[in-house]
Amino acid sequence: MEAHNASAPFNFTLPPNFGKRPTDLALSVILVFMLFFIMLSLGCTMEFSKIKAHLWKPKGLAIALVAQYGIMPLTAFVLGKVFRLKNIEALAILVCGCSPGGNLSNVFSLAMKGDMNLSIVMTTCSTFCALGMMPLLLYIYSRGIYDGDLKDKVPYKGIVISLVLVLIPCTIGIVLKSKRPQYMRYVIKGGMIIILLCSVAVTVLSAINVGKSIMFAMTPLLIATSSLMPFIGFLLGYVLSALFCLNGRCRRTVSMETGCQNVQLCSTILNVAFPPEVIGPLFFFPLLYMIFQLGEGLLLIAIFWCYEKFKTPKDKTKMIYTAATTEETIPGALGNGTYKGEDCSPCTA
C-alpha cells in the first residue's frame, strides 16, 4: 500500500504508546461524556413535530446532504490539485473532505440561531449516509493517487458509534422536553457547566498527548489548505441553500453543517490505512483542520452576533408595527404565529 509517486518515508515517529496511554484513555472517555451532554442539551431544544416536518418535506435535508457530500470532497480534491500537494498529503486532505458532518456543527448552529431540528437531523443522516458515501467517494477521488483499496478502510464501527452517541441523548432530551418541561432548563444549565469543564480538560489533555508533534504538520501549504477547506464549506453551503430559497435559519444551519467535518473518523482512517512511516506528521492533519474550523466558526458566530446587535434595535419598531397591523387586517392569524393557508414548510424562505 503506497501512493503513486510518493516521496521517501517521513523521518517521523509518534510518541511512545501513542493512543494507548492513560491520558489517551482519559481523553476518549471525557470526549464521549462531553458529547453525551452536548447532545442531551441540544435535544432539549428539539421537537418531534418539527423533526417530522423536516423528514416529510426534506428539501432542506436534501440540499444539506448534497452540500456535505458534493462540496466538501470536491473542495478537498481541487485544493490538492491547486496547491500541487504530494499524493500522500492530498490523500489525507481527501479523507477529511469525504468524512460526514461533525457534532461541532450542532453547537455552531445553536449559537447562530439556526434550526436545531434540521441540524440534528442533518448530522444523523449525514453520518448514516457515510456508511455508503465514504467508500464511494474515496474510491472515486483517490483513483490515480493511491494503489491500495482505501474504501475498505472506512471505520464502520466508528460511524455506528457516532450515530448512537447522537441519537440516544437527543432522544432523551426530546422526551424530557415533552414529558417534563419543568426540568429542561436545569438540564441545559447543568449540561453547559459540564461541557465547559470537559472542554478545559480536553484542551489540557490534547496538549499533553500531541505536544509538539502537530508542528510537523504545520507546513505553509497544509495550513493554507486546512484554513480554506472549512471556509469554502461554510460559504458554499450558505450560497447553495440560498439558491434554493431556504430561510435564514436553515441557510445558517446548512452552512455550519457543510463546513464542519467529523475529524475523529478521518483520524481513524488515516491510522488504519497507513503506517506512521508513510503517513508521518499528516496523521495530525485532522487536528489542524479542527483548529481552523473551530476558529473560523467562532469568527462567523461573532460576526453574526454583531450583526444581530446592530440590526435588532433598528428593526424592532418595524417588527412591532407589522405584527400589530397583521393581527388587525388578517383575522385568520393563529395563536402559534402562523396563518391559515400559510406554507409552514420548516425551511421555506
Curated annotation (Swiss-Prot):
Tell me the Gene Ontology biological-process terms attached to this UniProt entry.
Answer: bile acid and bile salt transport; cellular response to xenobiotic stimulus; response to estrogen; response to ethanol; response to nutrient levels
Mutation effect (S41L): Decreased function in taurocholate transport
**Origin: domain of life:** Eukaryota
Q: In which tissues is it expressed?
A: Expressed in liver. Expressed in placental trophoblasts.
Q: What does this protein do?
A: As a major transporter of conjugated bile salts from plasma into the hepatocyte, it plays a key role in the enterohepatic circulation of bile salts necessary for the solubilization and absorption of dietary fat and fat-soluble vitamins. It is strictly dependent on the extracellular presence of sodium. It exhibits broad substrate specificity and transports various bile acids, such as taurocholate, cholate, as well as non-bile acid organic compounds, such as estrone sulfate.
Associated disease: Hypercholanemia, familial, 2: An autosomal recessive inborn error of metabolism characterized by persistently increased plasma levels of conjugated bile salts apparent from infancy, fat malabsorption and impaired absorption of fat-soluble vitamins, including D and K. Most patients are asymptomatic. Some neonates may have transient jaundice or transiently elevated liver enzymes.
Could you describe the subunit structure of this protein?
A: (Microbial infection) Interacts with the myristoylated pre-S1 domain of hepatitis B virus large envelope protein; myristoylation is essential for this interaction.
Name by which UniProt lists this protein: Hepatic sodium/bile acid cotransporter
Per the UniProt record, the source organism is Homo sapiens
Q: Which gene encodes it?
A: SLC10A1
